Amino acid sequence: MTQLTHINAAGEAHMVDVSAKAETVREARAEAFVEMLPTTLAMIIEGSHHKGDVFATARIAGIQAAKRTWELIPLCHPLMLSKVEVQLEAQPEHSRVRIETCCRLTGKTGVEMEALTAASVAALTIYDMCKAVQKDMVIGPVRLLAKSGGKSGDFKVEL
């Protein structure tokens, strides 16, 4: 079984020392979904929401969240991200929005948490902007789709 890297020999939480690790190109992709009523989704698609462009706001929120992940997740390292991409796709056939994020850097630690945080905060932003018209929207699942680079190797979800 793989050891938990954020727990020291005494069983205490600590930030992992990455100073001896090699810098490599690292990338991670994540996704999140927001399920809603067809009328709520139509309002987003048509751009008729009274608060403005829901997708543009969620995209910016996701990008900002990726950049601030280290402030939200206690043991994450502050990272110099070279790329943050947030794509939003209305899926009327499922009455939902799909969010896919991609984060990249050249560094000593991975960007999985940044990609997951970007997807999560973009989903929360959609909820926040639309809660006045629908409070029972469902967020989820949120998951890591892929990661590459680093000592632990590559990972990709089987779709």
From Swiss-Prot:
Record-annotated disulphide pairs: none
Catalytic activity annotation: (8S)-3',8-cyclo-7,8-dihydroguanosine 5'-triphosphate = cyclic pyranopterin phosphate + diphosphate
Binding locations of substrate: L75, C76, H77, M113, E114
EC class (word): lyase
Any one biological process term the GO annotation gives: Mo-molybdopterin cofactor biosynthetic process
GO MF annotation terms: cyclic pyranopterin monophosphate synthase activity
Pathway of action: Cofactor biosynthesis; molybdopterin biosynthesis
Active site: D128
Entry annotated with the keyword Lyase: yes
InterPro entries linked: MoaC (IPR023045), MoaC_bact/euk (IPR047594), MoaC_sf (IPR036522), MoCo_biosynth_MoaA/MoaC (IPR050105), Mopterin_CF_biosynth-C_dom (IPR002820)
Keywords, in A-Z order: Lyase, Molybdenum cofactor biosynthesis
Ranges in a coiled coil: none
Cross-referenced CDD domains: MoaC_PE
Gene3D superfamilies linked: Molybdopterin cofactor biosynthesis C (MoaC) domain
Family, similarity comment: Belongs to the MoaC family.
Subunit structure: Homohexamer; trimer of dimers.
Function text: Catalyzes the conversion of (8S)-3',8-cyclo-7,8-dihydroguanosine 5'-triphosphate to cyclic pyranopterin monophosphate (cPMP).
Name this polypeptide is given: Cyclic pyranopterin monophosphate synthase
Organism: Serratia proteamaculans (strain 568)
Organism classification: Bacteria, Pseudomonadati, Pseudomonadota, Gammaproteobacteria, Enterobacterales
Gene from which the chain derives: moaC
